[in-house]
Amino acid sequence: MKHKKFDIVALFLLIGVFMAALDNGIISAALTTINQSFEISAQMGSWGITIYTLGMAVTTPIAGKLADMYGRKKIFIIEVILFGFGSLLVALSPNYTFFIIARLIQSFGGGGLFVIASSHIISTYTKEKQGSMLGGLGAMNGIASVLGPNIGSLLINVSGTWHWLFLINVPVAIMIVNFMMIKMPETQEKVKTKIDKYAIIVFSFSTLLMMFAINNIQTGNIANSILSFSVIGLFVLAMIGYGILILVEYKNEATDIDAFLPFYLLKKPAFSVVLIMGVLSGMLIGSIIFIPSFVENVLHVKAANSGYWMTPLALASGVGASMGGKIVDKKGTIFALVIASIISMIGYGGLAFLTYSTMPFLVFSIIAGLGFGFTIGAPMTVLATKSAHSAKNNSTVIGTLSVSRQVGITIAPTMFTTFIQFGYSQMGSKIKESLNSAHFGLKDIPVSLMNIMEHRSGNLTKILGQVNQISNDTLRRAITNGIEDATHLAYMPIFLTAVIASFIILLLVTLFRKEFK
């Protein structure tokens, strides 16, 4: 008997999904604090996010398959326990190596929550209600991603330490486990299969190579660094790895192994297109991580308050996800994704080109949030299950879509960090251009400020602090203009990439609309 109304089990599924998705957003507000705590560079610190998203990408399909084999209730509870235990280890980390290992354990727990919750909804709710319910699930996922920095900033301000960002997960996990053990029904039909361990290893290794390749691009010498083995060589090896992955899955089709990326799904053009859209939607999520640093460095908001500026986008994404689910129920997935893509392009386009003060930022972040929520909510999940047609089970389909999305989330921060580094590497030339237009030269810059900029011994706040001490108003304004030009150059490509991703989603939906019906 399928449900028509929202029930208490669905509520706790939403809480579990929210808890896991919150973690990547919550850490973005504390990255600087964590890096200082372990005395590591910002580039090294980004692995705290990267390893978590990679772990989730690998775990998502495995958890979905284990849920089909042993039951959704059992695997969901194990996932929550793993996540809570990992959170405790992260909070107690004595060094950065331990921190990274703990984050990986945490990701193994968080990776299966969304796919199991989605599968539960599709299996237990009527078709008329599935769009709204999946929209609510997408809303939790989206709101958590963008609300995380808010909560992170609040907890750091209240507690004075980053450890509580992770300790707070422990009692929530205990509550979910206790409730689900009593109330959540177990899957009635279970499928016994073998886990595709070789494909998982190849996928993980290839994705790591891709991330290292992007990370090795030298912002001061892009052309030569791209041609080096550490970039182009690793990229080629990653592509070979993905090719081997497809070959492995092709061979697995004739066996009883439950494929990591099922070849019978990859053979369906419509489903392959949905996977591409999944990667692109993951990149949209990845762009949100950099909003706090954007408002801090571009809009000059205090670091402690930067996470709060995610609130409008967070609320808008929740509204967008909910609306997206209802539109799917009434107008269909194609119409919903077309609207989502157009709204996203307008919002992210405004953030890229028109955001020079707080008011335009608020307006365009709300628009971007609406489109973002629409996109990651119900439309893609419903489209994936429809385009798969003969899929053996919903968990496999949703799990495969989640893998593609996690690939986008995993690679995007590494790519966007490279954009930021390139933008800031142009600071010297931008300042020089600004000084020349104001009839000044580099010789007019105070020695103390030149030392900070040349040796990168300070962050942007420290540099601006030195600039504000310059008594000559014209000189101070010229230097500030150069710094602001470099800062915009650092962040504009992030939002421009989101615009391009949204446009490609719109293009794919339009071109393949007949195949999706």
Give the positions of each predicted feature.
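Extracytoplasmic
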Residues: I8-A63, G148, I288-P292
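12-transmembrane solute porter fold
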Residues: I8-M19, S28, F229, D256-Q426, ...
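Interfacial helix-cap and linker-helix signal at transmembrane-aqueous boundaries
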Residues: I34-N35, L66-A67, I151-G160, I214, ...
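Cytoplasmic loop-to-transmembrane helix junctions
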Residues: M44, K129-G136, N305, N393-T400, ...
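Central cavity-lining transmembrane alpha-helices of secondary-active solute carriers
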Residues: T50-A63, F114-S118, T311-G324
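Helix-loop-helix hairpins in multi-pass membrane proteins, especially solute transporters
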Residues: G64-I200
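Hydrophobic transmembrane-helix bundles of small-molecule transporters
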Residues: N157-I276
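Hydrophobic transmembrane architecture of multi-pass small-molecule transporters
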Residues: Q406-L508
